[in-house]
Regions:
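Structural signature of hydrophobic alpha-helical transmembrane segments
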Residues: 24-33, 77-88, 159-169, 223-234
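Membrane-interface helix termini and inter-helical loops of multi-pass transporters
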Residues: 10-19, 137-152, 215-221
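Central hydrophobic cores of alpha-helical transmembrane segments in multi-pass inner-membrane proteins
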Residues: 1, 32-44, 62-63, 86-95, ...
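Short helix-boundary/re-entrant hairpin motifs in multi-pass inner-membrane proteins
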Residues: 109, 113, 161-232
Length: 250
């Protein structure tokens, strides 16, 4: 009957809700975001002379997206805010960025940033949907709720693949060598406020996402992958040190 179908649909989607919460880790990151947001406005007070209103709209848009990332406790909302903060950063770099050397314009830097982050976000979206559908097959409930998804039973191979989806997205945002090539151009071309937000806030969302979601959701796969992540970190340290020795432009 129609009533039975409606009841079944209600049971399937009963876990759909907007869930924001704050704990010790979140409050630290939200406080950092607020402080750096104020500094971003102050340092751009005299620097930005054109389309000032639109500039500050994008700046507040970024801060709102970042705060949303730090407060989201369901994966749909986390992904929504994760993607939301990328669009205004593109505008900050493309419209108010500094003029670069030939072949390294602010448009190119903004486009490179956007492509890298959007592509990695797509990988994370596939991993999120994979986790949600595995949970649905086990429980019959379609949900993005963090507490419910923590209880999902995953096979070793499935857990490892889903963890890699999250890790790739966070590795691009960190960024981890060799997925870092967007960052030097973005920093060089971004306005001062954009660099403050990029280095001080946006990159920290990757570490937060790793601690908040990837490690708790996929503990066994994360432990297995940890040596590889450490090797990547050591390689990045050595690579950065050697590269800095060859550069004369501070």
């Amino acid at each position: 009957s129609t009533q039975g179908v409606s009841s079944a649909a209600s049971d399937v989607y009963k876990r759909q809700s907007i869930h924001l919460a704050m704990d010790g880790l979140s409050v630290l990151m939200v406080t950092l975001t607020g402080l750096l947001g104020v500094l971003s406005v102050l340092c751009s007070w005299n620097e930005i002379q054109k389309r000032v209103g639109f500039f500050h709209l994008n700046l507040m848009w970024i801060l709102g997206g970042v705060v949303g990332v730090f407060l989201a406790i369901d994966l749909f909302l986390f992904f929504f805010f994760w993607e939301m903060m990328l669009v205004p950063m593109y505008f900050l770099i493309a419209l108010w960025g500094h003029s670069g050397s030939p072949g390294k314009s602010r448009i190119n830097a903004a486009t490179k940033f956007f492509i890298f982050t959007q592509a990695s976000g797509l990988v994370m979206l596939v991993a999120i949907l994979g986790l949600v559908f595995v949970h649905f097959n086990q429980t019959g409930v379609f949900t993005f709720n963090y507490a419910d998804l923590l209880k999902t039973q995953l096979s070793e191979g499935t857990e490892y693949l889903l963890m890699l989806g999250f890790f790739i997205a966070f590795a691009v945002k960190f960024p981890v060598v060799p997925l870092h090539s967007w960052l030097p151009d973005a920093h060089a071309q971004a306005p001062t406020a954009g660099s403050v937000d990029l280095a001080g806030i946006l990159l920290k969302t990757a570490a937060y996402g790793l601690l908040r979601f990837a490690l708790p959701l996929f503990p066994n796969a994360s432990a297995e992958f940890a040596p590889i992540a450490m090797y990547l970190g050591v390689f990045a340290i050595i690579y950065g040190a050697l590269l800095s020795l060859s550069l004369i432009h501070i």
